[in-house]
Amino acid sequence: MRSVITVHPGFEASWPWAADHLHRLWQAQGPVEFLRTAPGDNRTLSKLIPDPATVTRLVALGTPATPECVKAFSGLAEISLNDAHGQPDIAKKFADRGVTVIGHTSEGYWGQSVAEYALALALCGLRRIPQNHHTIISDLKPWDYSPATPPVPGGRGHQFGDDARFVNGTIAGKRLRIVGAGNVASRFAAFAHALGADVAAWDPYASEPSFHRAGARQEHHLERLVASADIFAPIIPLTQQTEGLITAKLVDALPAGCLVVLVTRANVCDMKAIRRRVLADELALAADVFDLEPLPLKDALLGRHNVVHTPHNAGRTRQANEEFAARLVERFKPVAG
């Protein structure tokens, strides 16, 4: 058996930790050749790998492939072709020749990273952690917890720095309402449930066990889901079917003070309605994704007291890279010991 991994710089621009981890995993199984090309080196697989006819297992990470490559790798049993946009035509040609083509069956490799980030955004939004962090760099006012004179019930008090106009404090006891029950949404639901949140989710494509395992009650009506939300998190991919799924009518039905968490794709929501209500201090927002990216430096959402914002980096951890590699390796046939 001859195992080869090739890596193109274009792939590593998106997944800088994946190739080396995949290499380590295959090294644990036996000999493996690892070919990392330099920027500008766009040789195809059959030009890059010596004696291609003897290769039996191949992972191509961004390396170009052509129909000539399909012919050249005559001894190939399994192949994984990976780049930013995929190579479906070449993959089909390998499959038609009897080669097992291996790829990801889902984007679960970054599920844990994005779900943890969603939890962090929710906690930051509830407690205004980023705002307080930033303000005390240049202002002592946040340290002053002096109440109003006379003190007002439900007002500022000793070490109470939350904004009572919005949902605040602990996630325990909050009504978390999630759109989605997939790899990210179900994990986020489970985390919040473990911390004491009352979790309900809507996803017409998910099976009942998806909700049960996540500690979420299944809601069958979006209108009912949004109406009871302390925290609202639409966590679904952006497709033709889901774009604008959360309409202005649904956004307007969110209770005043609700915290909206955006961590997958913003445009599943009517973002004009989200912006309108956030800028009117009717909703709080904790978001890693936006309708416009990058956000212009003068965007009205930036720096607001009721907005937590980060630059779309929830999913790309080292662990997500390593999981990307591990899930590919798991799909190859076991190597005889």
Describe every region a protein language model picked out.
Residues P9, Y145, T149, Q159-H193:
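Glycine-rich adenosine-cofactor-binding loop
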Residues T66-P67, P204-A300:
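Rossmann-like adenosine-cofactor binding region
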Residues R2, V7-Q27, H104-V114, G125, ...:
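C-terminal helix-to-coil terminal segments
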Residues A200:
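Conserved beta-strand positions in the Rossmann-like core of class I SAM-dependent methyltransferases
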Residues R36-P39, I102, R217-H221:
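Short acidic-hydrophobic, aromatic-tinged amphipathic segments that line or gate anion-handling sites
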